[in-house]
From Swiss-Prot:
Function: Major role in the synthesis of nucleoside triphosphates other than ATP. The ATP gamma phosphate is transferred to the NDP beta phosphate via a ping-pong mechanism, using a phosphorylated active-site intermediate.
Family: Belongs to the NDK family.
EC number: 2.7.4.6
UniProt-annotated catalytic positions: H117 (pros-phosphohistidine intermediate)
Record gene name: ndk
Protein name: Nucleoside diphosphate kinase
Entry binding sites for ATP: K11, F59, R87, T93, R104, N114
Annotated localization: Cytoplasm
Pfam families named among the record's database cross-references: NDK
SUPFAM superfamilies per record: Nucleoside diphosphate kinase, NDK
PROSITE patterns: NDPK, NDPK_LIKE
Taxonomy, superkingdom: Bacteria
A biological process term (GO) from this entry: CTP biosynthetic process
Cellular component, GO annotation: cytoplasm
Organism listed in the record: Pasteurella multocida (strain Pm70)
């Protein structure tokens, strides 16, 4: 199986609650290698661009407001089967239905304040990684 890369965002709710270390520890325990990281305070334009696929949905303004409310930690994670394994590790978007032991079940507040973002496909991962990182920033 080939090594893949996926984008992870540790979202504002987790950053504000000082959960970065606990979440990074989960990534490393699951065999992910951090190959890039940067702390960002997204602008409105950056948040709108990143979530452009949701711009016609009713929740879009609240999502953007949340994502610019505090810094995020953007990460590129690498391992075999990274996209699928990361999605399994973080759990369902709604923490109330996320599996026991997943990051969202353990740390999220609700479906919007759900602590982490993860790419949902290899194509999304490539696009999302390129949104935040240039190749020279990935090791």
């Amino acid at each position: 199986m080939a090594v893949e890369r996926t984008l992870s965002l540790i979202k504002p709710d987790a950053v504000k609650r000082h959960l970065i270390g606990a979440i990074l520890s989960r990534f490393e325990q699951a065999g992910f290698r951090v190959v890039a990281a940067k702390m960002l305070h997204l602008t409105q334009a950056q948040a709108e661009g990143f979530y452009a696929e949701h711009q016609d949905k009713a929740f879009f303004p609240e999502l953007v407001a949340y994502m610019i409310s505090a810094p995020v930690l953007a990460l590129v994670l690498e391992k075999e089967n990274a996209v699928k394994d990361y999605r399994t590790l973080i759990g369902a978007t709604n923490p109330a239905v996320a599996a026991e032991g997943t990051i969202r079940r353990d740390f999220a507040i609700d479906g919007r304040h759900n602590s982490v973002h993860g790419s949902d496909s290899l194509d999304s991962a490539k696009r999302e990684i390129a949104y935040f990182f240039v190749e020279s920033e990935i090791f």
